Amino acid sequence: MQLANRMQTLSESITIAISTKAKEMKAAGIDVISLSAGEPDFMTPKKIRETVKNALDNDSKSGKYTPVPGLPEVIEAIRAKLKRDNGLDYKANQIVTNIGAKHSLFNVFQALINPGDEVIIPSPYWVSYPEIVKFCGGVPVFIEADESTNFKVTAEQLKKAITPKTKVFSLNHPTNPTGAVYTKDEIAAFGEVLKGTDIIVTSDEIYEKVIYGKKFHAVASVSEDLFKRTVTINGLSKCGAMPGWRFGYIASSMDWLIAGIKKLQSQSTSNISSIVQIGAIPSLLGETDEDIENMRKEYEKRRDVAVEIINAIPGLSVVKPDGAFYLFVKCKDVDSDSLRFCKKMLEEANVATVPGVGFGMEGYFRISFATDIESIKRAIERIANFVKSYKI
């Protein structure tokens, strides 16, 4: 007996593996500080909690099946959000809710990718992108960014990576793990490269409201051509402090693709939790915007403190991110083997971080500042002492 061949292409999520190890160490009584998981430490906004409590007691729809794409009122709330925040006008039948944005991406690639199709992925990348592509039979093609461009790839790099087999350009903006945010002109340049092709853009915009001193531009909003070829993917896990609720969604003007995704979801998960859908409505309608902005301000304070302390540690350096809640820290001068470095850090300094190799780039590690400022300071102090006495 054995697993299907397609399972041989799939690797365990390194972020989840490290987070799990850190929790096991904590359970064993070890004082571990985890900066590994991209999980907001804030409580889900009160308005959302109250909405769900009320629905459980008074709404006959709570706990019932819903249409596969989602409740009509949830779809309308997503439409309103996309129009209000991003200037995007989608029809109700062009939106599908999913069990988090990871499920959204999985559905999109399952519906699009044939064996051998190439998907262009900027590197560093979120750990699950290439794994999902490979599982669907596709071939990840990486274009690498570095500190010289603030970890942003260029239109020229995209142009050089395109082949007759290219099916998708997969963009994450703001980016995990680097926090890179693309400008309107940079996105427009991607659009110019893609004109005249059948290449589809997937734009994962899950961190859109965790942004510092920049203006966010949804990819599909930049030009009519990009609107026609882009699948917008978003959710409430990061910006809305609802990671465990698992609420994501897909929006696209490509009716044939949305129809295919609905068909796929009807034979897999069907609808997402009715309670989660009801709870998402206040956030989608902008009723928790004040909470989201307060969280963003706190993230910004944490970012500034963490960047200053890390850049004072000999052997380490970090580019200040414009978005998300991660720092992608360079450790090449200490150890270019990021997996070894992070493993020793966890075992010897009791600080959990994620090795850069999981994001496609050696000599770096990622820390999340989605935790309280005192824990961040204590963790970085441990990292500094660890680096000072580090031996390969």
Can you say where each PLM-predicted feature lies in the sequence?
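Conserved N-terminal alpha-helix of the aminotransferase class I/II PLP-enzyme fold
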Residues: 61-98
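PLP-dependent class I/II
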Residues: 3, 7-13, 18, 23-31, ...
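N-terminal alpha-helical segment of soluble enzymes
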Residues: 56-60
